[in-house]
Each structure stands twice: as C-alpha cells, then as structure tokens.
C-alpha cells in the first residue's frame, strides 16, 4: 500500500478542517484521533477522499512516507507534550512535527531544543482564521528549522489563504518565532475588537444610533480606510435579530467577554521585554472588568457620575470623528504590536521580516485588513523602522486624525462613557512624541528612598544624592 504524504493528529474542528483542506489541494492524508469514534465520524465525512484513518500511533506513523510530516492539532500544553512523547519511539531522524495549536512560544522553544537532540525537526506554526479559515485557507506562521520548513512549504502554501495570488504564509524564523508572531497577532486582535466595541458604545450611547443605523455606519466604514474582516462582521452583527424577542441579537447578548489567554500572553511578553503595549493590555483588562458583571451592576447603583445624554446635533460630523479616532487608535495598536515583534526578534535573534508578516496577515486571519498593505510598504521603505508612527504615511494620518481622537475622548469622558483603549492610544501617542517626560521625578524618588541612583541631563555618569541632608 502506498504511503500518505502527511498525517494529522487531532480531529476537533480545526484539525478536521485542516485535514480536509490539505486533501482538497491534492495531498494524501492519514489521520489519527485518541478517541476512535472521532476518527470514524471523520472518515464518514471524508468518504471518497484520499484520507486514511488509523487507530494507533504506531499504525499512524507507519502509514506515512519518509521523512514523515505530522501536523499536531491537539490542545496546547500538556496534551501536546503527551502526544509528542507517544510519537517519539516510532519516529526516525529527520521526521518533521508541525504544531498547529495555540501554543505558548516558550513551550515551542523548549520542544524545538529537546526534539533537535533526537534528530526530529519541530515547526511551531501559528494558524489563524478559525473554523472557516482552516477549511478554506488560513494565515499560517511557521517557525523552526529553515531546512525542515522547505520540505513542508509546498503544503503550507497550498492550503493557506491567497491575496492577489500570493500565499498568506512565509517562513517566520527559528524555534518559537512562528508561535510568537501568532501570539502578537492575537494581541492585536484583542486591541482591534476593544477599539471597535468602544466606537460602537459611543455611537449607541452618546449618539443614540439604532442597530440599523449602526449597520449602515460600519458597512460604510468598511468601504474605506477601515476595510477589514472585523469591521465587516461587525456591520453584519447589527442586522441579526433575536428569534425569541425580535430585538437586535447584540442587545440581548450578556456583556461579559470571554478569552483564551493569548492576549494576556502578549502583554506578559511585552512586560518581560520592557516594551510599551498599552492598547492591547488595556483591551485585556477591559475583558477582565467586563467579566465582573455582578459587581458592576452593584456599583452602578452606588457610584455616581455623569448621566449619558444622547447628542442630537452634528451627528454626521461626530460619526466621522469616531471613524478617524478608531483608525488612528488602530494604527497606534499595530505600531505597538510590530514594535514588540521587533524587540522579540532582537532578544531571540529571529531576524523577523516585518513587511512579510504584514503581507501574510492580509488574508485568512482575523485581523486581515486593507491597511496591512501600507504597513508592508512602510517596512519596504525602512526595514528596521523603529515604530510605524515614524513612517511618512502613518505620520501624516495620525497628525491629521489626532484632533478627532481628542474630541471623541473628551465627549466620552464628559458623558461618563468608558473608553479605556481610545484613551490609552492617545496617551501612548502623546507620550511617544514628548521629548521630556516627568520620569526625572520618579528617578529622584527612587534615589531618595532606595539609593537607586540617577543620570543627569548636563553631564555623563551615575549619581546619588543624600536627600535627607
């Protein structure tokens, strides 16, 4: 019997859909799932396709041509380690494991090192696009040994999303680079979603827009600079009616946002690297505070503040101001995310190509947006650009739109409407463009109570003052 070209372990939604995607591009596939009933179920769905079901790890490994290419689609963490351990006795030198799960990049770095000692290649691969993307074409971010990537590259390119005929996948860098970039992608996604939700809140609470009007506004925004998957689906969300009440479905959804922790990982890494990531971090905190529903309801009856009074005049001008505020904040958020990737690349010697990363984000993934082309062009102009805000294209926009962001935040603050990520974006912009910040006082305080020393503006050296004298 001929051997299959690639194997997939794990037949939950993402694994199943990736297996079908791979087969649809002309590759033969073996599958294995810990529970055989899942395998049977999948084989029924894949009837007539070039897919072989296996019922033990040994049978699965033996069904594959060498060097074996195995895609792991199991739960991140201990389940991935357990699966790798069960595979190892059956693998041979130069076999390739591809981890397509939502894995923490430090776990990928560890596994890469451990498996290299056994002669096994390990490719930690970020996959974005959800259930539909897995089936029709996701954005794929592989990291690991470059020579191993060359062997799986034809498969990854074939199954990825395409934009202008270009595959939305590229070699990201060594060891944990692929999963790191996917993690930052998810952090940017948190920022995008929070900024959109704050825009919605202002339009609904302060401007009093109905669901139908909100649909029209977001659909119109999606035709211009904000053209993106998240704006597109937001416009669609406002058209959906609840079958039970007849109300817009969004109005009966509980305001408690869930999360899987990847936004938190992004913020933790930024803290470790000493990189400012306020918008994304504020977006993570916003989800935390949203989860405190009972406490917030109690506080709403005890703590006073401005009463929201819908604005009735100059609505069109204010809607345009919110659009500009959203786009400027989005630029600041991406600037922070790409600056974090730059810091990580320098820390871990990954040599990330930021323009290429922007290009593969254009299709298949959740943050896909037209303006990613502009990010790519910015890095074409200056491959080692310190911050996107310093690129001429983005500099001109933020300078032009900052007035709108200030106006929208002022309006929200006056009405008592929380806009933590908008406020964070403006504070970041103002801090970044300020040559002299009040950190001199912080250094004086640190030296006062802890003798932590300080530097001076007028001469070289490290200084300490006896403040109590």
Swiss-Prot record:
Instruction: Please list the residues that make up the active site.
Output: 182, 189
* InterPro entries, A to Z: 6-PGluconate_DH-like_C_sf, 6PGD_dom2, 6PGDH_C, 6PGDH_Gnd/GntZ, 6PGDH_NADP-bd, 6PGdom_BS, NAD(P)-bd_dom_sf, Pgluconate_DH
Q: Pfam families annotated for this entry?
A: 6PGD, NAD_binding_2
Could you tell me what reaction this enzyme catalyses? 6-phospho-D-gluconate + NADP(+) = D-ribulose 5-phosphate + CO2 + NADPH
What are the GO BP annotations of this UniProt entry?
Answer: D-gluconate metabolic process; organic acid catabolic process; pentose-phosphate shunt, oxidative branch
Top-rank taxon, per record? Bacteria
Q: Which residues bind substrate?
A: 102, 128-130, 185-186, 190, 260, 287, 446, 452
Keyword Oxidoreductase applies: yes
Functionally, this protein is described as follows:
Catalyzes the oxidative decarboxylation of 6-phosphogluconate to ribulose 5-phosphate and CO(2), with concomitant reduction of NADP to NADPH. Is the predominant 6-P-gluconate dehydrogenase isoenzyme in B.subtilis during growth on glucose and gluconate.
- What does the sequence similarity comment in the record state about its family? Belongs to the 6-phosphogluconate dehydrogenase family.
Q: How does it assemble?
A: Homodimer.
Its protein name is 6-phosphogluconate dehydrogenase, NADP(+)-dependent, decarboxylating
User: What gene is behind this protein?
Assistant: gndA
């Amino acid at each position: 019997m001929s051997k299959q070209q690639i194997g997939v372990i794990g037949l939950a939604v993402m694994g199943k859909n990736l297996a079908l995607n791979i087969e649809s591009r002309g590759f033969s596939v073996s599958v294995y799932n810990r529970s055989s009933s899942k395998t049977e179920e999948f084989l029924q769905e894949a009837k007539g396709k070039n897919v072989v079901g296996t019922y033990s790890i040994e049978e699965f490994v033996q069904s594959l041509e060498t060097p074996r290419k195995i895609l792991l689609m199991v739960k991140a963490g201990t389940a991935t380690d357990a699966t790798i351990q069960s595979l190892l006795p059956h693998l041979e030198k130069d076999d390739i494991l591809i981890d397509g799960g939502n894995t923490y990049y430090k776990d990928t770095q560890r596994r890469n090192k451990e498996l290299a000692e056994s002669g096994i290649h390990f490719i930690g691969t970020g996959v974005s696009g959800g259930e539909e993307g897995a089936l029709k074409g996701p954005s794929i971010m592989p990291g690991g040994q470059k020579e191993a990537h060359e062997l799986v590259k034809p498969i990854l390119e074939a199954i990825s999303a395409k934009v202008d005929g270009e595959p939305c996948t590229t070699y990201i860098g060594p060891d944990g680079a692929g999963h790191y970039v996917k993690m930052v992608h998810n952090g940017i996604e948190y920022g995008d979603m929070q900024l959109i939700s704050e825009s919605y809140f202002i339009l609904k609470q302060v401007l009093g827009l109905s669901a139908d009007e909100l649909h029209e506004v977001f659909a119109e925004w999606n035709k211009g600079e904000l053209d993106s998957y998240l704006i597109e689906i937001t416009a669609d969300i406002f058209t959906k009616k609840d079958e039970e009440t007849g109300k817009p479905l969004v109005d009966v959804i509980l305001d408690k946002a869930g999360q899987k922790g990847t936004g938190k990982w992004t913020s933790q890494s930024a803290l470790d690297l000493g990189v400012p990531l306020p918008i994304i971090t504020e977006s993570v905190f916003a989800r935390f505070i949203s989860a405190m529903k009972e406490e917030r309801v109690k506080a709403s009856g005890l703590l006073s503040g401005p009463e929201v009074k819908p604005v009735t005049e100059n609505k069109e001008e204010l809607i345009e101001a919110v659009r500009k505020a959203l786009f400027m904040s989005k630029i600041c958020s991406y600037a922070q995310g790409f600056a974090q990737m730059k810091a990580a690349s320098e820390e871990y010697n990954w040599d990330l190509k930021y323009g290429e990363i922007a290009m593969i984000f254009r299709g298949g993934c959740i943050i896909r947006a037209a303006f990613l082309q502009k990010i790519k062009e910015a890095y074409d102009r200056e491959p080692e650009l310190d911050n996107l805000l310093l690129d001429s294209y983005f500099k001109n926009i933020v300078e032009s739109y900052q007035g709108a962001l200030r106006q929208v935040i002022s309006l929200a603050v006056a009405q008592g409407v929380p806009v933590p990520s908008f406020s964070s974006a403006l504070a970041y912009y103002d801090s970044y463009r300020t040559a002299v910040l009040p950190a001199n006082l912080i250094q004086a305080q640190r030296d006062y109570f802890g003798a932590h020393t300080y530097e001076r503006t007028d001469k070289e050296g490290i200084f300490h003052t006896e403040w109590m004298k």
